[in-house]
From Swiss-Prot:
Species: Pseudomonas sp. (strain P51)
Annotated protein name in UniProt: UPF0065 protein in tcbD-tcbE intergenic region
GO CC list: periplasmic space
Highest taxon of the lineage: Bacteria
Keywords carried by this UniProt record: Periplasm, Plasmid, Signal
Annotated compartments: Periplasm
Coiled-coil spans in chain: none
Family membership noted in the UniProt record: Belongs to the UPF0065 (bug) family.
Primary location group: periplasm
Span of the signal peptide: 1-32
Annotated CDD domains: PBP2_Bug27
Length: 336
């Protein structure tokens, strides 16, 4: 009669549990090491607009400073088109490891209101990293324009509905929205001429092919000083320190409370680990606090911001609510 020993199921189960714990600890440790090693290769910072604009300048100045301390090069990659959608979509579809990040502004909030098919959901497919900077814009006309002030411009617009044109850097960009909001608040009809970025729009403005443009002080200050364009009003509630002689649109046009500020936020793809977001946040905060970065941006009329990721998240939410309300209230659309 043969005897056989039954296997000790309790011991086998215990060994499997211990092996599973060991494997989980090893995997967790390996993952932690990978996160601690971030960044492990150069970081691509996507600017969804052409070179030469304010958003591009902000990214380039900050990226140079970041490259000195983060252990890898931070490379700016301009991916312009569709008011910022092409570049933003590239980041939305990038691996969520923090090596591809985005800088964008109001367009990321409102693009779904102006374009029939946006390939991402801006409130779900991006993780806020940090609010980098804010800056006001300025309404400018060609140097030889017949308009000496904003009241003359608005009077002509009322007398010639749809005849006066304004340039923008694309549908849904902050400078498009500023002009559309001005037209709506002043009860005038303007012709919208969208361009693929600020630079070609400015070229046509200087050449007199369009009547006006609201653009960042950063992009227009040198043109104003060189008298290639004439400034009629700034979009902030207070006069700009670098353009003290230029009135606010609120005061010059008699539109109390008129204010449109461009904010520039940094975003990562959805699913980016919190530790990576916090590292990026810390590095960008450190960069924008550096005196040379503060001074370089100040010379361009840009005010650094900073703070925790939640600061940008709260701003994104409030800006979405604000512009959604304004778009409905004033019936803003792509043609305005």
């Amino acid at each position: 009669m043969h005897s056989s020993k039954c296997p000790d199921l309790a011991n086998i189960g215990r060994r499997r549990v211990l092996a599973g714990i060991a494997l989980a600890m090893t995997t967790s440790s390996t993952r932690a090491q990978r996160l601690d090693a971030f960044p492990s290769r150069p970081i691509t910072w996507v600017v969804p607009f052409p070179p030469g604009g304010a958003v591009d300048a902000i990214a380039r100045i900050i990226s140079r400073k970041m490259s000195e301390s983060i252990g890898q090069q931070v490379v700016v990659d301009n991916r312009a088109g569709s008011g910022g959608i092409i570049g933003s979509d590239l980041v939305a579809k990038a691996p969520s490891d923090g090596h591809t990040i985005l800088i964008n502004s109001t367009g990321l909030v409102v693009d779904r209101f102006f374009y029939p098919r946006v390939p991402y959901q801006s409130d779900r497919d991006f993780v806020p990293v940090v609010l980098a900077a804010t800056l006001p814009s300025v309404l400018v006309v060609p140097a030889d324009s017949r308009f000496r002030d904003i009241t003359q411009l608005l009077k002509a617009a009322r007398e010639n509905p749809g005849k006066l044109s304004f340039a923008s850097a694309g549908l849904g960009t902050s400078i498009h929205l500023a002009s559309a909001l001005l037209a709506a608040r002043a009860n005038v009809e303007l012709l919208h001429v969208p361009y693929r970025g600020s630079s070609p729009a400015v070229s046509d403005l200087v050449a007199g092919r369009v009547d006006m443009m609201i653009d960042s002080v950063t992009s227009q200050r040198q043109n104003i000083l060189a008298k290639r364009v004439r400034a009629l009003g700034v979009t902030s509630l207070d006069r700009h320190p670098q353009l003290p002689e230029v009135p606010t649109i609120a005061e010059a046009a008699g539109l109390p409370g008129f204010e449109v500020l461009t904010w520039c936020g940094v975003f990562a793809p959805k699913g980016t680990p919190r530790s990576v977001v916090e590292r990026l946040n810390a590095e960008i905060n450190k960069a924008i606090a550096a005196p040379d970065v503060v001074e370089a941006l100040k010379q361009l009329g840009i005010k650094t911001a900073g703070g925790a990721p939640e600061v940008l998240a709260d701003l994104f939410k409030s800006e979405t609510e604000r512009w959604q309300k304004l778009i409905v209230e004033y019936r803003l659309n792509a043609n305005q």
